[in-house]
């Protein structure tokens, strides 16, 4: 089975087993769900903004509106056509559907300097070319705008560089946000992948509780570096070290 088919089957199973959760109440909730407060803060006092969610899966959960800002949310995913077929199959009507496209092709899809905020969660390190993808994210961001990225630390190494997990993003021992991969030597500072004209606005490294499949949980038990296996109230809890960073485009 291909990775893409496996991914589609995963969502088909979720939709089948949680069908009621994705019907009218969910659609109404999505329509009125506000953009997260920390992202609204990045947008400042602008009256109207355009926001892009990259690698969103079949349903972007970013938040479709802000009470104080005229907000246009768009979403893109490399499997969007298959996801939209799946949404049609189940009859889901959602406020924002993803369009088909790879992160490396953002400029062709949307044009340069098109968005006030670009959001990318758990997908930069899943791209075919993380360096080109990051450059494209910056290119489609307006001067003065922000690129918000969230990844699990060293996903490539934790997954033995299998399938889509070809890249490692991590903070080096000397505190530098770094990009690497199995066949990439030496590893490089992540912002070196981008032309001049940007700066690291914010960075945070913390533990989170991801949704892990059985294989990931087994790796966690075996003590892979970026997964931690703990016991809480008698229940096993897996946490992952997450890196969240924001790049500001000068302007």
Predicted regions and their residues:
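Class I SAM-dependent methyltransferase SAM/SAH-binding core
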Residues: 52-106
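Conserved class I S-adenosyl-L-methionine
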Residues: 148-177
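Short alpha-helix
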Residues: 168-208, 212
């Amino acid at each position: 089975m291909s990775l893409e088919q496996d991914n589609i089957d995963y969502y088909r199973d979720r939709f089948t087993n949680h069908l009621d959760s994705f019907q009218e109440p969910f659609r109404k909730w999505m329509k009125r769900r506000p953009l997260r407060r920390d992202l609204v803060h990045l947008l400042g006092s602008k009256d109207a903004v355009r926001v892009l969610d990259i690698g969103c899966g079949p349903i972007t959960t970013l938040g479709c509106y802000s009470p104080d800002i005229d907000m246009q949310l768009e979403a893109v995913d490399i499997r969007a056509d298959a996801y939209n077929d799946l949404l049609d199959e189940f009859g889901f009507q959602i406020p924002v559907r993803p369009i088909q496209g790879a992160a490396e092709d953002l400029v062709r899809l949307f044009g340069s300097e098109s968005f006030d905020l670009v959001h990318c969660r758990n997908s930069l390190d899943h791209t075919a070319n993380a360096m080109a993808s990051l450059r494209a994210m910056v290119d489609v961001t307006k001067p003065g705008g922000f690129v918000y990225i969230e990844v699990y630390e060293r996903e490539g190494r934790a997954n033995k560089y299998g399938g889509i997990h070809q890249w490692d993003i991590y903070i080096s021992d000397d505190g530098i946000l770094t990009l690497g991969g199995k066949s990439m030597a030496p590893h490089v500072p992540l912002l070196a992948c981008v032309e001049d004209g940007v700066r690291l606005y914010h960075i945070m490294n913390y533990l989170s509780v991801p949704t892990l499949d059985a294989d990931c949980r087994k790796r966690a038990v075996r003590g892979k570096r970026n997964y931690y296996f703990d016991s809480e109230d008698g229940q096993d809890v897996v946490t992952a070290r997450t890196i969240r960073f924001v790049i500001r485009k000068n302007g």
